[in-house]
Amino acid sequence: MKSRVVVGLLLLVAACTGDGETGGGTDGPVGSDPGSTEATISGSPATAGESGDMTCWTAPPGGGESAISFSDQTEAMGLVTPLVGMYGHAAVWGDFTGDHRPDLFMGTFADREPSIYQVRGADGAAPDRLLLSAEGGFTLDDRLADMFARTSGGAVADLDNDGDLDLVVSRNFDDDMPAAPGVQVLRNDDGGLTATTESGLPVQLGGRSVGVLDFDLDGLLDLFVTSDDGGSVLLRNEGGLVFADATAAAGLPGDIFGLGVATGDVSGDGLQDIFVAGSNRLFVSNGPGSFTAADSSVFTWQFFGEEDLISGASIADVNRDGLLDIAVGHHFNSTVDEGASVPVRLYLNRGDNGFEDVTEAAGLVGLPTKGPHVELNDMDNDGWPDLVTTASAADGTRPAIFHHQGLNGDVPTFSAPEGLGNPQYWVAGPSADVDRDGRLDLFLVEFDPSLPSLLMRNETSSGHWLEVAVGPEHGFGIGWRVEVHEPGGALIGAREITVTQGYSAGVAPIAHFGLGELQEVDVRLVAPGGEPIDLPSVPADQHLRYPAGCP
C-alpha cells in the first residue's frame, strides 16, 4: 500500500575539507538518486592538528553469542533499590554531569493507592528519580526535588544554549496533583536539575512523548509534546527557557492525538519533519517555521478493541537508499485480553512516491503482547539496523528484537526472535552504550511495581562500530544528519542525531552505526538547513565527537 507524500531526497552537493571548514573542491551528490547508494567523499582526514582529536574513546568489537543476547545487570549496576515503589513509564538517557557517561532519569505514575507500591521493600510511592552514572554503576542523585506525578515521557536538550543538557518532562496532568505541570523543564546547573518557573509551558496538558527540533532554524531548540487528549503542541523556544505555543502559527492543527513522536527529515529538504504515533500523522516542513500535513493514509491500522493504541516511533534508513524510514510500535490491549497477534509496522520511504507498508514482506510477524517501544538500531553491529521492540521473547525474560538479515531487492528482511508468546512487555526500552564497549544496551521500563525495571547489557558478538556525536557549540547536533560510507564508496547507514526514540523515552544525542567488517569509513555530517561537513577515512571502533572530542 502506498501513499503519496512530497518527498525529494536532499542533494548534498557542497564539499568541505576534513577540518570542517568549507573548501573549494566539490563532491558528487550523495543520494541524489534514491536507487543508488554509490557516493564518494573526498578531502583530508580530520586528525589531531587539524580539527583536534575528535576521538573520545575506543573499544574493539566484542565477543559473545552469535544471536542477539543480553545479561541482566540491574543489581550489579545499582538500579534495584533506588527504583522500588515505581509505576515506571518514562526513561531518559543523557549526560547531565559532563563526564561523557549516560545518566538515567526515570519517571513514574505516583497517583495510585499507597498500598499498591508497598512491594519489594518499598514504603509507598517513590518520586521520579535521577541516577548518575559512573564506571562501576549508578548512584541516586538526592539533589533532585521530589515530584509525585504521572510522569509519562521526557527528553534531553540544551534548551538555554549554555553548553549542558537540560531535561524536559511531560506528564498526564492530574487535578489531584496540581504542583506537577503537564510539561516542565529542569535546568541543568553543574549536573543538578532544577525545575524552572514562568516558562510559558502548558500546565494542564495530558503530555506523553517529547520531540526536540529547531523547526524555525533560529538556533534555539523547540519542543513538540504529544498528548492523548488530542491537543499535542509545538512549543517555540523564545530564549531564557521561556516557550510559546506555536502550533497554529506553524500550520499544525490543534487536534493532534499522539502518544509517540519521531522527528527527522523524511522529505529530503534538509529540514526536520514530525511523525506523530497515535493518530499516525506526518507533518512535513515546507520551510523554516511551518509545516504541511501529508497524506498519511498509508499509516492507517486495524484495531481490535477500544483500548488498542499506537504508541512509539523510530526513524532511520533501513535499506541504504539514503531515505529515512519509519517503524511504529503498538499498545494493543487486545493482544493480552483477546488473544490478538499484532506486528509492529515498518514503512519504507519511497521518495516522491511516498511511504510503503512493508511489514509483512519484511517478515515482521504478529506479537502476542504489547510492543509499545520501537527502535531502529544495529544491536550486533553487522551494518544493518535491527528492529528493537519492548515486547518480550525468551519466555518473557528478554526484549523481542527482529534481526536484520539484509535486503530482498530493496526491502529489508528480518528474522523473528525465539520465544515469542509470553504476555510480558515493557513500557519503554531506550538504548545507550552504558559500558563503552561499542554495543548498545537497553533499559527496560517496568510498569508493575512488583517487578523491577531492567538494565540489559548487550553481550552479542559484534562487528566494528562507530558512534558520532556533536559538541555543545552546535547544540549537541540534535537534528543533524549523519551518513557513513565505505571509503570512497557506497552508503552504509544514514540517520539523524535525535533525543527521542520509541515511546515515552529519551536517548542521548548520539548516532550509532554498526560497520560489519569495515575498519574505516567516510563520515558526512549535515546540520538542518546547512552544508555538508566531510570527515574521510575515520577509523572504526570509536566514539567520535565533532569538532573537538570530549574535553
Question: What are the residue ranges of the model-derived segments?
Answer:
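Beta-strand-rich domains and repeat architectures in extracellular enzymes and scaffolds
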Residues: 77-113
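Calcium-coordinating acidic loop motifs
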Residues: 94-97, 101, 134, 157-164, ...
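Repeat-based blade/solenoid architectures
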Residues: 78-91, 144-155, 199-211, 251-262, ...
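Beta-propeller blade repeat segments, especially FG-GAP/WD-type strand-to-loop junctions
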Residues: 56-73, 113-141, 177-196, 231-246, ...
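Hydrophobic beta-strand segments that make up the repeating blades of beta-propeller
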Residues: 104-108, 167-171, 223-227, 274-278, ...
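Gly/Ser/Thr/Pro-enriched helix-cap/hinge segments flanking short amphipathic alpha-helices
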Residues: 77, 81, 291, 410-551
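Ser/Thr-rich, Pro/Gly/Ala-heavy low-complexity intrinsically disordered linkers and tails
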Residues: 13-62
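Solenoidal tandem-repeat scaffolds enriched in leucines and small polar residues
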Residues: 197-235, 245-247, 253-283, 295-297, ...
